Regions:
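Conserved catalytic core of the tyrosine transesterase superfamily
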Residues: 1-276
Length: 276
């Protein structure tokens, strides 16, 4: 895409989109360009519609992936190129949604214990024990770890809502060990470039590698640890409104799905619990 890519990214920055959203939209624009082997500004509404159908019918992509591609295309063509009304569509979101897969606490411990080094262990412990999104944990700064208050500040997370979440005692000790060994600078977790935060893809690879070593199966990427955090809190009796604040959800219904996970897990285990 070249110059168009830069223009689109600048357009998104000016609209206040998060780095994670920008990366997603740019990825889908790149895939669209590769699919047609043409510059995206030469494509018609029919071309875009055919590509979206390709994702739905041939690739069988998840709805969230298709919706992200659709949103990115709409912003590119209607927003950046000012084509007016876009005439490509996707189906409405399916009403039936799968409950998030959640590991038992023991499996989370196995995954964390299977990490290859202290930095990887600290990364996964922080992700799980604070319920962070992957782009939130990779963009933590050392000063966000508020040890006196036993809190972690999540700065400008999804939806640009700052919040505080838990800092577990074991996580704090691991982070202190990590600090003494690695001496991080501006960013708490970095990759090969010490001046930039760890790439999201690197964090995902760390999780997948640890999960494979541990022998734990099921689940998807590192985001599963965030689902585990919320469900384990509700299992422990924390009310859903508190979970909502720590997770940074804008809607209580988003947090309430973890209550359903808890009820399901208890029913299949032969236990009963009333969650008000």
């Amino acid at each position: 895409m070249g110059e168009l890519r830069e223009r689109f990214d600048n357009h998104m920055i000016l609209r206040g989109l998060s780095p994670n959203t920008r990366r997603g939209y740019l990825y889908h624009m790149t895939q669209l360009t590769k699919f047609y082997m043409r510059s995206p500004d030469t494509l018609s509404n029919d071309d875009i519609q055919k590509y979206l159908l390709h994702l739905i019918v041939r690739k069988k992509q998840a709805y969230d992936t298709i919706n992200q591609a659709f949103s990115g295309f709409r912003l590119f063509y209607a927003g950046l190129l000012r084509r007016g009304k876009t005439e490509f569509h996707i189906p409405p979101r399916p009403k039936m949604k799968k409950l998030p897969l959640v590991y038992p606490v023991e499996d989370v411990v196995r995954i964390i214990d299977a990490t290859g080094n202290l930095k990887h262990r600290a990364l996964l412990m922080t992700t799980y024990s604070a319920g962070l999104r992957v782009d939130e944990v990779t963009r933590l700064r050392p000063e966000y770890i508020e040890s006196k208050r036993m809190l972690i500040r999540v700065d400008q997370g999804k939806g640009k809502k700052d919040r505080y979440t838990l800092l577990a005692a074991k996580t704090l000790q691991t982070l202190r060990d990590y600090w003494r060994s690695y001496k991080p600078g501006e960013w708490l977790f970095v990759g090969k470039n010490p001046e930039k935060p760890m790439p999201i893809g690197t964090a995902q690879k760390i999780f997948y590698k640890a999960k494979k070593r541990s022998g734990v199966t099921g689940g998807r990427g590192i985001h599963t640890l965030r689902h585990c955090f919320a469900t384990h809190l509700i299992d422990a009796g924390v009310d859903v409104c508190t979970v909502k604040r720590m997770m940074g959800h804008s809607s209580l219904s988003t947090s309430a799905k973890y209550v359903h996970v808890t009820k399901y897990r208890l029913s299949v285990s032969g236990y009963q619990l009333t969650v008000s």
